[in-house]
Amino acid sequence: MSLTLIPTVRTVLSVLVAFMVVLVAGPAAEAQGLKVGILHIGSMADGGYNQAHAEGIQAMKRNLPGVEVIEVENVPEGADAERVMENMVKQGAKLIVAASFGYLEPALRVAAKYPEVKFFHPGGYKRAPNLTTYWASTPEAFYLMGMVAGRTTKTNKLGYVVALPISFFLANINAFELGARSVNPKAETRVVFTGTFLDPAKEAAAANALLDQGVDVLGVIVDSPITVVQTAEKRNAYSVGYHSLGAQKFAPKGWIGGIAFTWGNLYTRFAKQVTDGAFKSENILGGLADDYLTLAPFGASVPADVVSLVTA
């Protein structure tokens, strides 16, 4: 009797171990079969908007090593974006991130044709059964960076180079101003609009115009902060980055901090939704507390007590 029980127990244990391996390996195996497509309006090395999304995708790949990514940069909005998304679907993408505001309508059209593919759009105001919208709430982060700028400035003149006078950007500037005045009642913020999301010549001209007025801390809300950050550095002014931490290297002396989107955890969540069959169309909004944003490492010129105040 005992001779027959031993192999029986071993057999049962083997089956249990195999079952546990299947349970553990299941999600990883599913992730290995997932193709994710993402298209960018500009360069993935712009130190700003596009780089932040590209960094988020790379973080997702680290979290889910089996995921395959199809990534295309410098895709114009409109018909070109629609064509690129169609090609991604044909290549087997089951999740597509249309990473520009102007990609919304093309994404909706492609989503209607391929209901089995899930689409994600940042900042969109329309959804579809297979399209989710998402964004990060930034005024809190701008308020905190305003505090840093307000304590750093020596002229009490702060400046911002901004693409367009839309409500979302104006809310950020107002938050920055309130943060600055909370620690320095004499601080004031001046703004120049470029009228476009990417034009280095206009951005440099706007930055220089503000610096000529005595501004000594420059912030930026355009796709790539590199030009404004470099201009401030050349003129021995301080700078505040936006979108990505990538522009920090262009201002080793003047950089005081920045506000960066950290999309990695959210993109990982999206991928898991698709592989787990748990997708639902929704509008997602988070902020610093949700790890959708971070404040860049502070520059050496920022006093320790200011860092403690902002990070408390």
In which residue ranges do the predicted regions lie?
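Short non-domain terminal segments
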Residues: 3-4, 17, 191
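A residue-level marker of the well-folded mature domains of exported/periplasmic proteins
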Residues: 31-312
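Signal peptide processing junction and immediate N-terminal pro/mature segment
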Residues: 26-30
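N-terminal secretory signal peptides that target proteins for export/translocation
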Residues: 1-9
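Bacterial N-terminal signal peptides
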Residues: 11-25
